[in-house]
Structures are given as C-alpha cells and as structure tokens.
C-alpha cells in the first residue's frame, strides 16, 4: 500500500473494529483482540496484497469471533471462483 493514494505504509494492521487498512501503532495487542495484517507489494504497475486475520489469546472460544471467522471464510470460498487476472477485486 506504500504510496497508493498517499498511504504511508507497506503493511497495515486492522485491530478489532477497524474494517481494513489500519495504520500500525504502538498499542500492545490484548487477549481477545482480532487483528488483520495486510502485506502489499507493488511491481510492474500492479499492487498485490496478502491478508491474514489472527485471534489473540482465548478469543477463539468466543461465539462472536467464531461466527465472524466462519462468515469471512464462507465469503472467501464463494468469491474465489470469480477471481482471475482480468477482474478487479472490487467488482466481485
């Protein structure tokens, strides 16, 4: 993301209620936090991104966390067949 529309970082971290592209800061992660990490690359005029979401501590036992993760996984599997090199992700 570094430089894309003025974004100041190559890695973004979205903690809890931050939807996406949060800026890393000094706040320590706490038990129960959900954090998504986006790592981006810019090469030959194209931006690529890889994202992973992690649950910190015992939140894996939290029903809301399990539900959010299952819905996100379902969306991934439903959208995945529609991706190809000619499609822009926002179109899906």
Regions found by a protein language model. Give the residues of each.
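Active-site neighborhoods and metal-handling regions in enzymes and metal-associated proteins
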Residues: 1-92
């Amino acid at each position: 993301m570094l430089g894309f529309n003025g974004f100041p970082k190559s890695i973004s971290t979205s903690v809890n209620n931050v939807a996406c592209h949060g800026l890393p800061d000094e706040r320590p992660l706490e038990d129960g936090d959900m954090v998504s990490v986006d790592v981006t690359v810019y090469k030959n005029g194209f931006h690529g991104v890889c994202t992973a979401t992690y649950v910190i501590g015992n939140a894996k036992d939290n029903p809301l966390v399990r539900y959010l993760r299952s819905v996100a996984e379902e969306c991934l599997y439903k959208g995945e067949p529609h991706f190809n090199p000619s499609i822009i992700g926002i179109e899906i």
